[in-house]
């Protein structure tokens, strides 16, 4: 992996960065990684203040999130909700690109309700020196359902004045190869859910040794232990681990019964017994 993106920072008038968000971007917590902090706001002043704050940690590249589809986000016209106001978005981009020399990449969807919105959005993006335009070819209304709109992505490839990165539904080496066969000039691909669902996907793409079941078990165990040291109480830890297993379970030749047992676990001890059962009784299918 050449580049990582942090969970988004959502600045407000009271605080630029919450304690949890600060932990995400502290250099000592990201040793050896090229990390790009992600910012989500519709206020140019807040964006620039956050950039200035991040510079003190040595960051010279940030990312603007225009892709998040969560209802609590879009109701505030942030994330993909900002795509509904192209004129305000254009003014916002003008102000932030004039206000800093830090490299700014953008992650966007192709519209809020329809891909028909995308040509206007792309014409706005083309006015600015975007370090990297990461396109997830779904609308906000799609969330993560339906299939990526490759016609819209082809339009981006043909008309974007900025370097493009593709994001969406790369779950296997076959998915990656199919994408690159369609777009041989594409310079980069971003993985999100794909690497959670298939931890071997990058090794597979690069032709490297695939992770063994024991390696994944060690990772899952350590992750749970770290959550327990960082979070208060069992419920938030279980929430985080169940969120991961929603995707990771698909890497195993497991039945619905064991998946439900993980989902229904009410205590960490119960969760750990079930996960141990999974690793003992089911093989990887990646």
Predicted regions located by residue number:
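Flavin-dependent oxidoreductase catalytic cores
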Residues: 1-286
């Amino acid at each position: 992996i050449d580049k990582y993106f942090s969970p988004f920072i959502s600045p407000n008038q009271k605080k630029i960065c919450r304690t949890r968000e600060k932990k995400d971007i502290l250099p000592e917590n990201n040793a050896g990684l090229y990390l790009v902090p992600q910012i989500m706001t519709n206020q140019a002043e807040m964006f620039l203040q956050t950039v200035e704050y991040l510079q003190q940690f040595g960051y010279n590249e940030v990312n603007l999130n225009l892709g998040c589809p969560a209802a609590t986000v879009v109701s505030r016209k942030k994330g993909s909700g900002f795509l509904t106001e192209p004129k305000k978005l254009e003014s916002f981009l003008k102000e932030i690109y004039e206000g800093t020399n830090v490299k700014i990449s953008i992650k966007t969807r192709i519209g809020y309700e329809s891909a028909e919105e995308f040509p206007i959005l792309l014409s706005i993006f083309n006015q600015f020196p975007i370090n990297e335009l990461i396109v997830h070819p779904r609308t906000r209304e799609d969330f993560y359902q339906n299939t990526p709109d490759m016609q819209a992505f082809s339009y981006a490839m043909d008309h974007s004045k900025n370097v493009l990165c593709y994001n969406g539904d790369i779950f296997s080496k076959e998915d990656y190869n199919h994408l690159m066969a369609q777009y041989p000039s594409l310079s980069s691909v971003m993985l999100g859910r794909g690497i959670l669902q298939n931890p071997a996907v990058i090794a597979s793409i690069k032709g490297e040794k695939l992770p063994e079941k024991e390696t994944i078990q060690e990772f899952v165990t350590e992750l749970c232990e770290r959550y327990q040291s960082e979070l208060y109480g069992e419920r938030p830890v279980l929430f985080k681990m169940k969120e991961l297993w929603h995707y990771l379970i698909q890497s195993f030749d497991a039945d619905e019964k064991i998946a439900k047992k993980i989902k229904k676990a009410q205590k960490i001890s119960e969760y750990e017994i079930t996960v141990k059962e999974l690793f003992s009784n089911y093989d990887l299918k990646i």
